[in-house]
Amino acid sequence: MSNLVPMVVEQTSKGERSYDIFSRLLKDRIIMLSGEVNDVTANLVVAQLLFLESEDPDKDIHLYINSPGGSITSGMAIYDTMQYIKPDVSTICIGMAASMGAFLLSSGAKGKRFALPNAEIMIHQPLGGFQGQATDIDIHAKRILKIKDKLNQILSENTNQPLEKIKVDVERDYFMEASEAVEYGLIDKVIERK
């Protein structure tokens, strides 16, 4: 399977211009986060967020998410940038937002977190696998527990759920349909049409 990116041709008073589809969407302040959250995708999303802020710091940015999750540090780079920039970041789940994808979905501007009707959202605790000397494993175990506490605290703030409920719910994969994610507080509304 090839990774062809569609091109869009626009007619303007200055002539014809072609864009790849993602560049064209960026003109409308739309960023796509699809696939695994890793350093490459995080760098692209962060760069686009910063670019759009520089273009217009008062206009909302729309982050569409279809992601199974991925790296915590990469996801936190996106999260921190979403909080750092001036424009509100509206989040929209298309398909699935799981793990770090769900965390980012819930971290959009309050009142501007959405999912399409058949989207699926899943939260769980951080995953980690380490090997090496016992002392190194102990260091990594303490670190992942610290990260787990931080993520739980932010999820509690994002959802208005008690921290104790979050701790229980993330112990295992917790799947929700879009309407259930509204009740839980991960998103604000299920949208069917623009």
UniProtKB/Swiss-Prot annotation:
It catalyses: Hydrolysis of proteins to small peptides in the presence of ATP and magnesium. alpha-casein is the usual test substrate. In the absence of ATP, only oligopeptides shorter than five residues are hydrolyzed (such as succinyl-Leu-Tyr-|-NHMec, and Leu-Tyr-Leu-|-Tyr-Trp, in which cleavage of the -Tyr-|-Leu- and -Tyr-|-Trp bonds also occurs). Its EC number is 3.4.21.92. The active site is at S99 (nucleophile), H124. GO terms for cellular component: cytoplasm; endopeptidase Clp complex. Disulfide bonds: none annotated. CDD domains: S14_ClpP_2 (cd07017). PROSITE patterns: CLP_PROTEASE_HIS, CLP_PROTEASE_SER. It holds the Pfam family CLP_protease. GO terms for molecular function: ATP-dependent peptidase activity; ATPase binding; serine-type endopeptidase activity. It is an enzyme of class 3 (hydrolase). GO terms for biological process: protein quality control for misfolded or incompletely synthesized proteins. The keyword Protease applies. Cleaves peptides in various proteins in a process that requires ATP hydrolysis. Has a chymotrypsin-like activity. Plays a major role in the degradation of misfolded proteins. NCBIfam families: clpP, PRK00277.1, PRK12553.1. Fourteen ClpP subunits assemble into 2 heptameric rings which stack back to back to give a disk-like structure with a central cavity, resembling the structure of eukaryotic proteasomes. Belongs to the peptidase S14 family. This is ATP-dependent Clp protease proteolytic subunit. The lineage of its organism: Bacteria, Bacillati, Bacillota, Clostridia, Eubacteriales.
